[in-house]
Amino acid sequence: ESVAIAEPMLGEVGDDATVINDDKKAVAQAITDEACKVAGYDSMEAAAEDGTAFVFMGHGTSHTANVTYDQMQTQMGDLGFTNAFIGTVEGEPEDTACEEVIAKVKDAGFKKVVLRPLMVVAGDHANNDMAGDDEDSWKSQFEASGAFDSVDCQVRAASSFFQTPSRAMNAFAAPPSSPGQP
């Protein structure tokens, strides 16, 4: 067994929502591929044609790193995924709050919604805040809006697209440095 230390999964934060990088692109592609597969679609485009939006719910933070969520939304757009939306359970940044995301999905005209955590571990936030039966869960709020024909939840962590935890770590770990190299 070994321990590897890697860069953050989403790479550098950057200064504003337009700063994206190869790490964000790789994560965006991986999570959308997996979400489509689980939902029975061949691609994000096929899901969009069927009227399905995917909402990826992250944690959120009041730290300046919260721009990462807007950067992920920018990355989804750059990939052409008009049916991918980024939200946060803590509602920070504000445009990622549940009610804001509901409005965006509704305004975009999608009638089917798939909620999925944008978290390494699918724990309490995924099971309760996203998929729970309480009226304040994301699922309940999307349903209560009356704007959607269906709201489904995929309670799977962002790391689930890797077969083992070691593959997840290795996928984002920097290659070992050569002797004499930092």
Language model features: what each stretch is:
Residues 1-175, 180-182:
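Extended amphipathic ligand-handling, pore-lining, and cofactor/metal-binding catalytic surfaces
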